[in-house]
Amino acid sequence: MKIRASVRKICEKCRLIRRQGRIIVICSNPRHKQRQG
C-alpha cells in the first residue's frame, strides 16, 4: 500500500474507491494499491 498525495490509475484494471472519506485504488496487481493521505 502506497500512501500518496495524489492517487491515480496506473493500469486499466485499477479501480478508484472512496472508503471512510479516503480515496483508495484497488487492483488485481498488488503493487498498484494506493491510498490518499
Swiss-Prot record:
Coiled coil: none annotated. PROSITE patterns: RIBOSOMAL_L36. Keywords: Chloroplast, Plastid, Ribonucleoprotein, Ribosomal protein. GO terms for biological process: translation. One of its GO terms (cellular component) is chloroplast. The keyword Manganese does not apply. It is found in: Plastid, Chloroplast. Belongs to the bacterial ribosomal protein bL36 family. NCBIfam families: rpmJ_bact. This is Large ribosomal subunit protein bL36c. It comes from Phalaenopsis aphrodite subsp. formosana (Moth orchid).
